[in-house]
């Protein structure tokens, strides 16, 4: 048997981290087994589905490195398949027309609530006679289509993550709606609904394994009945744990960040997000391993090692993983990733003219980055010819010998336009010896004169970057003139 799995998002919003994590697990399982990973867009909610969300979902999956083998398939392009299946169920007596109005259904729920009963449809239109149906139609009522659910039926499946799951038919809320009422009196029924469409798609696409969130367990019980009724093979199910916030509640928009776009804007690399999502519910065979590519994770992946318990989202862990990927990037590859964040922080750069300088900057600040958004802050002291003296810098310039260091460094900078690291290091050693100062005094004074503070990135590399831009001499001049 060739494994066939699918990720089936609804384009009613941008790619959510929960959907992305489900996509990661499906992708890993498909690659581990040599199977097929299918993208299916469940866009039957015509009011909320939008083309821009469809595009966002696809681009988000691609950004994460989750390439699909088949698709994307769109449910709105398969409506005939669903209508055919609904008609089949009607012809077999497994589905029927229900003419209940929304007011009647609300009255039903209120009566059940008053008796402390769980809300459910009471199946009152299950066995209407043709005359009763005709009378209801004469009132102008348009029917929904409901699928018969046997309250006595016990639905059992062996979940690949949760073990045996048992669901009682009486707990499914009564006969379920599988098609809306049509606004057109000439049509037998309206828009097919989620549970029916999903099952028809899975049968037509020969899906062998359905890997999705545990919030779909009730849907699975309903869908198993539909697979059987339509004569399709029931796939193997695996229900993954929910992603939780630090309080142990389901991660939601109230937590501030939920879409992949949000994480991207916050400066996370796709490799880091994909890596972290692997660990949100799955434990590698080597539980100490935390950094791996998707391909490396796929070699080890199994559903048996996916946890049942909810996976708490850990920002510190994600930050650490992201920093590992950032620190491993060659400076030349880091540069194009930094530029948007440098510009967002108010630093203007010319990638063509400043390429070598930017590589030097990336080399300098790269090891201190946790997120790409840190770039503007980490490089703050290295842009512009204006010296902003902080309090610690002013104090350092008042130390005996500090101004002599700056004057000598200014002369040296003016005479050495093509400064190298070795030359900068040699000048510091020369000043230490000739001025009779401690090396720490020389370095702190020079740092204060170049960057306005005694704290900051590596002094020698910073001096080179400022010298290459012509900012070193300007800043040193300002520092010497400072009172």
UniProtKB/Swiss-Prot annotation:
Annotated organism of origin: Synechocystis sp. (strain ATCC 27184 / PCC 6803 / Kazusa)
Family: Belongs to the class-I aminoacyl-tRNA synthetase family. Glutamate--tRNA ligase type 1 subfamily.
Any GO BP annotation: glutamyl-tRNA aminoacylation
Descriptive protein name: Glutamate--tRNA ligase
Keywords: Aminoacyl-tRNA synthetase, ATP-binding, Cytoplasm, Ligase, Nucleotide-binding, Protein biosynthesis
Binding site for ATP: 253
Oxidoreductase listed as a keyword: no
Domain of life where this protein originates: Bacteria
Motif 'KMSKS' region boundaries: 250-254
